[in-house]
Amino acid sequence: MRHRHSGRQLNRNSSHRKAMFKNMVTSLVEHELIKTTLPKAKELRRYAEPLITLSKSDSVANRRLAFARLGNKATVGKLFNELGPRYEGRPGGYLRIMKCGFRAGDKAPMAYVELVDRPAPVAAEPVESSED
């Protein structure tokens, strides 16, 4: 019987699931926008949001906890140096999940996961042509 077991199984064993979400959180912190299936996106919130909350108070102990969960020094650095200060005044809800249709191959529901309040991409300025 499956009583009080929280979380989605996603047809994977526990080590595969753990590695998959570790990679997804790393990609999310690095790129601030990823595309994945809707069930994975909803489950990703359970892994990413506590890490961002942890990064709001910068300490050696918190950095070690984040490194134990992510295993990537550059990602932990960005988490504590950029994302923690960015979300200092926000009490939660750091991710936005936007549905984006269905995948072509198997019609799986897809979604974008992005960090709220991420800076807009900088557009290249037009180059003036020099007419002599």
UniProtKB/Swiss-Prot annotation:
Record keyword Ribosomal protein present: yes
Domain of life of the organism encoding this protein: Bacteria
Entries under PROSITE patterns matching the protein: RIBOSOMAL_L17
GO molecular function terms attached to this record: structural constituent of ribosome
A cellular component term, taken from the record's GO annotations: cytosolic large ribosomal subunit
PANTHER family xrefs: LARGE RIBOSOMAL SUBUNIT PROTEIN BL17M (PTHR14413:SF16), RIBOSOMAL PROTEIN L17 (PTHR14413)
Protein name, entry field: Large ribosomal subunit protein bL17
Organism: Saccharophagus degradans (strain 2-40 / ATCC 43961 / DSM 17024)
